[in-house]
Amino acid sequence: MSKQEPVIKVSSEVGRLRRLLVHSPDSGLGKVVPSKAQDWLFEDIVHLETIRKKEYDFYTKLLLYFLDPGLILGKLKNIDAEKNKRNFYKPEHKEFFRSDKVIELQWLLAEILEDLEIRLKMAASVCAIENCSYDTQKELLNLHPVALAKTFITGTLESDRMLFAPIPNFIFTRDIGIVINEYVLLNKPAKKARTREALIAKYIFFNHPFFKAYQENILELNDGYHHFLLPKESDDRKVTLEGGDVMVVTKDHLLIGVSERTTMEAAHQTIQLLFERNIVKKITVIKIPKKRDYMHIDTVFTQIRRDAWVMLGVFSKKSMKHENEDSVQRALEGSKKDEKLKIIQFRKKDIENPVSFDNLEDLLTEISKEDLQCSGKIKFIYSGNNEFPFDAREQWTDSCNLLALKEGVVLGYDRNDKTTEAFKENGFQILHAHDLIRQLEEGSLNVEQIGRAHV
């Protein structure tokens, strides 16, 4: 790792990806049962080997080719040989790839658990959260750090005995914390099922040598005064924030979603904290309907280039205008505050005079033109190609939730056919992961040659 290269720095949603935290699908995903799907916030009953071998392994390969090619280029035949039993992809195995660019959280956890003091504190904390017996706590302390890290995440011992619930959402690593320039804002999950994730993330960020130089740059939100006295219906006054509701569009401009998982009070506290620390100059709060369909703002829009965005059409200018012109609908639904889009922008130098936007397209256009100095027409690619019912169906299966490997090159799911058509119609090349990996491995293509593409 270069001494000049910062470990932590994010000032764009579409800049060249250098490092990211990941977590491989663990055995806990295979323990999810229908009766606990709502409680554990994981509604898919997955076939574990399928999502590992036919989905996540391909994702890992692509990340390594783009971020850490020395670990994979020219070695894939041996890595994927049947005799090696996927050991390259298993975080607990000695043959695991252990990249310092594609960074596995389970390994970071195992490394900090080598410290006895941390091991004692974490075992006590996890057992308190999960209401375990003292005997269980002692049993955990007898485990090797690698095995203990795995159990903290999966909830299961090597013997396959379950001690407590899995945390299947740990694979969504964006939610555990947000990098804003050279700062890390830790999350405060809205649901109890994600409390253990937040605890693990906190211990890693505050204790792993990888983040040692950034201890003063780790930010946490505090619960409000007498928060424990708030009635359940006062949800907006509670402080909950998840990473899917925060986007760093430029070094000076942050977007915060107020959603099913992130509260207005959390947005308020984040604005105060970031402005006081001079971390950004402008923050836009995007209040979306509190619906499971949307969950976070990154499920309804994502930036794919400085001048291009993918989004759900119901928040477009045309759709919002039609809704506002329908006087009957407006009269009937006027009181449904939680079902309306609201966008307010605050500037540190003029915080008393916030600016409002009527629709998402106007905000995103301003970001591209004013913040990012784009002079041409701003492109909007719509979920499901803006066709009913495909727009809603494909948004549910993450058509708007993409990962930019570099500007104009994004990773998405192959199941969203209509959205893929929309990308193609807007000049993007559609690349299938299997074919792209083959070309990268044989040398007929390199990552620098890939321009505008949906993978």
Regions found by a protein language model. Give the residues of each.
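The feature marks the mature, well-folded catalytic cores of soluble enzymes
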Residues: 2-452
